[in-house]
Structures are given as C-alpha cells and as structure tokens.
Amino acid sequence: MPRRIVLSLAVAIAALLLGLVLLYAGYILMDAWMDLHAMPAAQTDTVDGNTISTVALEAKAAKVDSLSLDGAVMLDAMMDDLSSGGYTAACFDIKRADGTVGYASTLGTVAAAGAVSSPAGDLRSSCQKLGKNDLLVLGHIVCYPDNVQTAANPAWAVKSGKTAYTDPAGNRYLNPDSTEVYNYIRSLVEESVRAGVTVFVLEGTELPQAAGTFNHNGFADLSKRLTADLGQDVKFLQPVAVNITSTTTADLKKEVADKCTQNLNENQIYAITCPEKSRRAVKQLLDDRGCTCYLITE
C-alpha cells in the first residue's frame, strides 16, 4: 500500500479517535453541570398543574440532627430509621432558635457572626440521595429569635430604648421590619434551595407582645414576601404546635384526639413534641386519624 494512503488512513483514524474522546468528555462535563445545577425531581414536580407552593403537602416528617446529613454513613443510617418508622420526610435545622445555622453556609453574614454550628456536612448530596429514596427534605427555620446575629449586628435587633430587647428567658429578636433581616432570612432560604431544599417550616415568626408592634410580623407576611421573591416552586409551612406529654397507650390516644383537632390548610403542618419513647405510638395515632402532614420531634 502506498505510503501516502497509509498516512491518510492513520490521520483519519486519529481524528476519529480524538472526536470520540472529545464527545465522551463533553458528556461527562454535561452530566457534572446537570448534577451541580439540577434540583431533585421529587422536590420540583407540579401536582395537577399546580406548583408546590399552592398544593396541600403530604409529609410524615421526623426531626433529624443536621449532622446526619453527611451524604454518607450517617445519612444512610438516618434513612433506614425513617423508612422503618414509616416516615416520608426528614426535617433538619437551617436556623435554630439561638441563631446558629445548621448547614455549611457560605454567606458572609453567617461567617462573620460565626453562626455555623453542628452543620450538615454535605447538604446537596444528602438532598439528592433522600430524593432518590422518595424522602422529602424539610428545612426548619426559627426566624426572628436570634442571639447570634443580634450580637454581631446590633442594628438588626428589636430595641428596648437604645439597647436590644431581651425577654425574661434571655432571648433577643431580629427586627421583622428591617430590610437587612428579611434579606438575611431570604439568603438562608435561597442558599438551601440551591442545595435541593424546597419546603421550609417557618417557626418563630411572631414576636412577644412586650417586644412592640411591627408592620411585617407574622407567618403570612413573611411567607408571602418570600414566595413573591423566590417563586412558586418553594413552599413555606406554618407549624401548628402540639405538645404531647402522655406515655401510656390510653392516655396518648385521648391526648392526641383532644389536641390534634384542627383542620390544617395547605400551608400548615402539625409540629408534634413528645417523649422519645412515645414517638412511634403518636405517629401511629396520627396515621390512624388520617393526618398526612406532621412533624414529630422530641
């Protein structure tokens, strides 16, 4: 075979191989980009043409430690516990009542205040893994009680005279009328949404009467503003607090029947506090009553 033909074939084969390599690399990069930017499918679906913010949510949730969202061994153990207990959702702390943040936030305001504590180690991959196992992720935000940011940013605090208002238990509060406070809460939500969380339980939206009167106090106002800014694919739930103290079967049955009587709207969730040893029985009683949206914690 003439040398010119051999060289031409070699060049053609090399070009073909290079093209295949580049095509394969392109697919890998595209998959990586989609993993980085995609939201879990279970978190963004619509129901009968309605967005998640407008439908009644079915979530039988247990409160879990933020540390368990490590994307690895602790997450697997937590998912096993939820599945064996008949739960369909996990709820973790985004912002706690003391002002600490329960995930590895990169927000400058969080870092400057040193607010991160016992965080979820890998929130993004944990949300993806939970979604693949048909478990919904709920983010719990205690909105206005905050001893961390009120110390780091005194101008954000509710004032009593020239100093921060402090309740009898020593708690300070963020000012609901402050633009900076609203932007802070919104930033926490936005960052969590990017990691894969689309349902948020907003607690601590009402301030004590002694703290004063505010234009933007309350769940309805805050959730409306957040929905307007973030869109209809994010849902906000108002917790309806129920404290269960009984431990015997008969007493538990009566207490649950007496206290869980409210017909929840599409933006509410029962927030059940009960002794650890009663959790399984309380969950069964809620299921027997046809409750489909609740959060059980200790």
Q: Where is each model-derived feature located?
A:
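Substrate-binding cleft of secreted/luminal carbohydrate-active enzymes
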Residues: 25-27, 31, 250-298
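N-terminal, intrinsically disordered, polar/charged segments of Gram-positive cell-envelope systems
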Residues: 31-60
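Active-site-adjacent "subsite" loops/lids of carbohydrate-active enzymes
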Residues: 50-63, 144-190
